[in-house]
Amino acid sequence: MVVAVGSFQKKFLQEIFEKIRFTHTRFYHISEGFFLEDVVYTPENIDNIVALEYKHSMLDGRSAVFKRAFDIFFSLIAILVFLPIMLFIALLIRLDSPGPAIYIQKRVGKRGELFTFWKFRSMYTHLSVGAEYGGKKAQDIYKNLIKSSSNVRQGVLPKIENDPRVTRMGRFLRKTSLDELPQLFCVLWGTMSLVGPRPHLPEEVKNYEHRQKRLFSINPGITGYAQVFGRDNLDFEDEAKLDLYYIQHRSVFLDMYILFATFGVVFKGK
């Protein structure tokens, strides 16, 4: 697709690019001295006219295939290695508080599609949000905690520090990130990646700005650029900026760096 618009139509150009992003259509812009921010581009010659080709990602073609193969191989190895630990954690969760060991939710993944998300349950079952858990009562308790708590991480979906709904075992799992181990199965099935943006909830997504919907251009990850360099200390806007930076600059080497950095972050209990 080739688009030639003046600088006064910059918003229009942005909307076109966002709409075709998931189709991976090649996108060229014949520029009049301006370009879109936060987008990787390269100059191209089209019939002796200089145009900018906007890239959907730095990771395309064979690199994308390699990333998927990398995800399958290492998630399978990790599942085999950590399976005894996961079974032991599941037992401890059941002993610590009644209810299932696995907490299942619908999250928003690639192309904005819902997928089944797994993690170890870290809250009391009757206080966990979800129709199959605490239901409307749990949702009302969450809203009241948001209003009454003095230490809330702001964003499209606020998060409570020192959340009283979290179990004793849950606090340990969250601090060590062991609650995320079941997501290895999501990686193996292809709904998640080892590295990518944080998987968000449908109620978060409905409040996204147009630009933030770029987060749906790739699979969400167990860990990611924002998780490593900000973890839970970031508000949503800053988290989204880091994840958008990753999407535009991702590569196999950047993924490897993030994975190694994740071990350091988890070890420090950040």
Where are these regions (language model features)?
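N-terminal hydrophobic signal-anchor/signal peptide
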Residues: 1-83
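Hydrophobic alpha-helical segments characteristic of transmembrane helices
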Residues: 24, 30-33, 181-188, 228-229
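Short, glycine-rich, amphipathic interfacial segments at transmembrane boundaries or analogous
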Residues: 34, 42, 102-164, 223-241
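Residue-level signature of the cytosolic catalytic core of signaling kinases
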Residues: 47, 58, 62, 162-165, ...
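Residue-level signal for cytosolic alpha-helical hairpin/rod architecture
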Residues: 51, 166-170, 241
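A hydrophobic, helix-centered structural microdomain
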Residues: 63-139, 186, 252, 257-270
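A short, structured surface patch at a secondary-structure boundary
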Residues: 144-219, 258-266
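C-terminal or late-domain output modules
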Residues: 210-269
